[in-house]
Amino acid sequence: MLTKGKILISEPYLGDSTFERSVVLLCEHNDSGAFGFMLNKSTTLTINSVLEEQLTFEQNLFLGGPVAQDSLFFLLRQDRAILKDSVHIKDDLYWGGDFEHLKTLIQEGTLELDNCRFFLGYSGWGEDQLEYELEKHSWIIADINSEDMFVKNPESMWQNVLRSMGGDYKVLSNYPIDPRLN
């Protein structure tokens, strides 16, 4: 069932290079559509390379999706809503909020940088678009905890999540990117 906090795992034969082997955290789903962030698409860009002001901290950015790639978004893990205007997703997971307050919390050490992930862009679907893609078997819906979202090696997340699901999903985790090359 599609609800915020679920992940969407792209089928290995999706045929869309943007979402190839992606794991998308669903941050919102309603009658108007859905949006989320790709958790496993890191970039070589850093937060200070895209902001006009230089921050006192540095972190690599992730590609959140193909929409609004000139905008910065963020996810964070926090025991309670300490960041102003952050939106609760599930458990200890939130997205967005007051960026100035976020910078202060990180500088004070109230919020650890390891509990933040910054994204350029987001993944978005219009009304019924995601449901249509699910009918076409483009995505697998699964659960994930926030600890597994903030792994040090996100590039292997797609394969690791499928493998941990077992059964046929474990077999899918070994599906080649281009089976014609086998």
UniProtKB/Swiss-Prot annotation:
UniProt cross-references to Gene3D superfamilies, sorted A to Z: VC0467-like
Transmembrane segments: none
Gene Ontology CC terms: cytosol
Stretches assigned to coiled coil: none
Protein family (similarity comment): Belongs to the UPF0301 (AlgH) family.
UniProt xrefs under HAMAP family: UPF0301 (MF_00758)
PANTHER family registered for this protein in UniProt: UNCHARACTERIZED PROTEIN YQGE, UPF0301 PROTEIN YQGE
Protein name per UniProt: UPF0301 protein CHU_1773
Organism of provenance: Cytophaga hutchinsonii (strain ATCC 33406 / DSM 1761 / CIP 103989 / NBRC 15051 / NCIMB 9469 / D465)
